């Protein structure tokens, strides 16, 4: 992403190595790292950044509401991007560590459902929603701080908690996340390291508006007020 977060959830450089904010809080200027490229070899520059952010708002993709105050994103030069806002937004830097800050290759032609073109240390070699995703070290990765530590990473999707813990105990997997508190207690502290942290999951209670009674707005309001 254009920006990143550290383990304390504080905003850090990402594709942008630094940035400036105008006194009125309505102009953000981002200075990009040099010599960046996508996994397909295409150069990653300010045009890609500006295009990606503008597309997010124009097409109203996921989290487009987070850049609601954006008037436009533009490439000043190959390594400089300027974001102009209609009103100041103190959350903008934080938002640019997430979906609004994702940068896509504006010139790439590929099927986004089956392929991925990114700029990180790994590329997606294969994906099966029922079993696993295989990541491969990106030979064209431009960064120095997060060089791939291993050539391949296999992420398996284990739907049964007990089976997942047994896979860890048998050595079938090296890392397990998440693991519920009850099963975590069964792991030998001398053999395994169990880490706990705040989660970012969101739980939503939504109305099924195909239900005859819930179609009535007054019923939904009454439930909400209860």
Can you name each region flagged by the protein language model?
Residues 1-23, 54, 117:
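N-terminal lobe/hinge region of extracytoplasmic solute-binding protein
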Residues 10, 96-148, 152:
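Gly/Pro-rich hinge or "lid" segments in bacterial periplasmic/extracellular proteins
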Residues 17-60, 76, 82, 213-215:
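Aromatic- and charge-enriched surface segment that lines or borders ligand/interaction sites
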Residues 20, 24, 65-105, 126-128:
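Surface-exposed binding/hinge segments that line
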Residues 110, 140-186:
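Ligand-site clamp/hinge motif
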């Amino acid at each position: 992403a254009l920006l990143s977060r550290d383990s304390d959830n504080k905003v850090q450089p990402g594709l942008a190595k630094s940035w400036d904010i105008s006194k009125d809080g309505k102009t953000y200027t981002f200075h990009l790292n040099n010599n960046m490229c996508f996994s397909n070899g295409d150069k990653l520059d300010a045009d890609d950044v500006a295009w990606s952010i503008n597309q997010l708002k124009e097409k109203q993709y996921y989290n487009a509401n987070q850049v609601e105050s954006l008037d436009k994103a533009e490439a000043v030069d190959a390594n400089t991007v300027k974001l102009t806002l209609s009103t100041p937004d103190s959350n903008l830097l934080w938002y640019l560590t997430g979906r609004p800050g994702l940068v896509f290759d504006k010139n790439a032609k590929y099927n986004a459902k089956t392929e991925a073109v990114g700029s990180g240390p790994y590329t997606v070699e294969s994906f099966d929603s029922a079993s696993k995703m295989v990541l491969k070290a990106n030979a064209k990765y431009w960064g120095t701080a997060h060089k791939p530590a291993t050539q391949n990473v296999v992420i398996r999707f284990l739907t049964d908690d007990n089976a997942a813990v047994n896979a860890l105990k048998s050595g079938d997997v090296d890392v397990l996340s998440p693991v519920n508190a009850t099963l975590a207690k069964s792991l030998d502290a001398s053999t395994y390291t169990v880490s706990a942290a705040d989660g970012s999951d969101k739980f939503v209670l939504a109305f099924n508006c195909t239900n005859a009674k819930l179609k009535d707005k007054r019923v939904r309001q009454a439930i909400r007020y209860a």
